[in-house]
Amino acid sequence: STFFNSISSVLGDYYGSIASDVLTTSIKRDKQADLAELRGRRLVIAAETKAGDRLDESTIKRMCSTDKINACKKYKDPFDFTPSHTLVIYTNNLPKVATVDDGTWRRIIVIPFKHKFVGKEDIKNYAEVLVEEAGEYILYWLIEGAKKAIDHGFHVEPPEEVVEAINGYKEQSDTVSLFLSERCDLADKTAKCPSGELYTKYRN
């Protein structure tokens, strides 16, 4: 949270937040008002999805697309806008992804933060300290990074650790393949199992 709190502070009004449940299937309410708050933002952050939450793929695709979004603030007229933001979810519980289609997974990047700051390393309200002492340098770093991304046509090669994290997340999300590899003998071409029994074992 220190990392993203520092960035959001230097971005000012270009930063926006969104409730994490808007990005999951845990709520069924209309999301138009939530999406309306994204207009003009450059960075949108959602924090801490709950264990067991499932990603709402259709909402994610809308938010991470170049297609116009139709939104409406409460008691206001609806309007269209083109997304200009990068969406970030920082959480200890990666939400479940029910689909394995490329349309969803090409939008997902997993960046693991493995280091834990304890004892003297753990500085209270460190984001505020960073912004106060080095806010202009953080903003400069962001601008330089954006320029590099633009220069490379927005195709930036991810580090190996990020690629491994994405692949691991995708494998864990593909529950059918996981079930087949762990519970079924695929080498035995003569093996049979009643479909009802197979489905019950998969569900359990």
What are these regions (language model features)?
Residues T2-N204:
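Feature primarily recognizes SF3-like P-loop helicase cores of small DNA viruses
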